[in-house]
């Protein structure tokens, strides 16, 4: 009989991706982008609590950001989280590049086995084909969380 055991030597890594290139009417976009900032903070804090290394990638513009912001490489701990939180605190509700360019960059940086959590304002922002392509490339799960779905009544 074979028993499948969890391999504790495997490092779980995650990329947290914040997209602000939304397909929403302008009146709806800003509040949903603000919700995305909160969701991103919550996801990063949860990964910190679980001691899971994570990278961060975004297309959000950050006013006066002093350090790296659009891509923060794998890390864990207070300094890593602070870099991301500082950017979220300075973030404007404006994208620096398209969602397609962002996801192309994410896919180029992706590694086999790396999971992805994509946070986005609208339900329609990320296509199923984009999710499938990233999942097929890494062989890992891709979770898309839309602020529109989270805040829906």
Task: Give the ranges of each region predicted by the language model.
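Exposed, interaction-prone extracellular/peripheral surfaces
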Residues: 1-153
């Amino acid at each position: 009989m074979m028993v499948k055991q969890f391999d504790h030597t495997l490092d779980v890594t995650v990329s947290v991706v914040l997209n602000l290139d939304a397909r929403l009417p302008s009146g709806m976009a800003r509040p949903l982008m603000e919700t995305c900032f909160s969701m991103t903070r919550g996801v990063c804090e949860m990964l910190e609590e679980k001691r899971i290394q994570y990278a961060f990638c975004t297309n959000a513009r950050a006013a006066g950001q002093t350090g790296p912001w659009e891509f923060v490489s794998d890390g864990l701990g207070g300094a890593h989280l602070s870099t991301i939180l500082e950017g979220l605190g300075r973030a404007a509700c404006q994208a620096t590049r398209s969602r397609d360019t962002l996801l192309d960059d994410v896919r180029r940086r992706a590694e086999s086995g790396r999971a992805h959590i994509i946070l986005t304002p609208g339900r329609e922002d990320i296509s199923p084909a984009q999710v499938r392509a990233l999942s097929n490339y890494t062989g890992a799960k891709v979770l898309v969380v839309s602020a529109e779905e989270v805040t829906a009544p």
